[in-house]
Curated annotation (Swiss-Prot):
The lineage of its organism: Bacteria, Pseudomonadati, Pseudomonadota, Betaproteobacteria, Neisseriales. The gene is rlmH. It catalyses: pseudouridine(1915) in 23S rRNA + S-adenosyl-L-methionine = N(3)-methylpseudouridine(1915) in 23S rRNA + S-adenosyl-L-homocysteine + H(+). Specifically methylates the pseudouridine at position 1915 (m3Psi1915) in 23S rRNA. InterPro entries: Alpha/beta_knot_MTases, RlmH-like, tRNA_m1G_MTases_N. This is Ribosomal RNA large subunit methyltransferase H. It is found in: Cytoplasm. It comes from the Bacteria. Its main location: cytoplasm. Belongs to the RNA methyltransferase RlmH family. S-adenosyl-L-methionine binds at L73, G104, L123, S124, A125, M126, T127, L128. The keyword ATP-binding does not apply.
Amino acid sequence: MKITLLAVGTKMPRWVDEAYADYAKRLPREVQLELKEIKPEKRGGGVTAEKGIAAEHARLMAALPPRAKLVVLDERGRNWTTMQLADNLKGWLADGQDIAIVIGGADGTAAELKSRADILLQLSAMTLPHGMVRVLLAEQVYRAVSILNGHPYHRE
């Protein structure tokens, strides 16, 4: 199974890249976590939030892996526990289905992308920095896989 994390934004602080890479490399061979950075649209100079979202949407659509289950992060999405993530991951692994998880830009994601999503997922009711979201997702994927493999990383 391949999980592709499509994140609008580039040039993250080194600690973000290092923490993300650490969790990604801990995963077993049957679960690959790949990061695809999507160039954000510059704002200002007549580029409205709507135009920026549209440009980022086009880039995201071009980068989406074909036939992958689409999970889009959204503040109005479902709020899963780690165990719910593990349960869903178990089903996706059994189906052999690849996953694409989208972290939108500063102004969010296009309504079209949200309507196309198989799952809208909320990580927190709080606003989180994009770099932190990358690390949090990588850690939660690792934790969910650890649960499925009976590894003692997660404690109930």
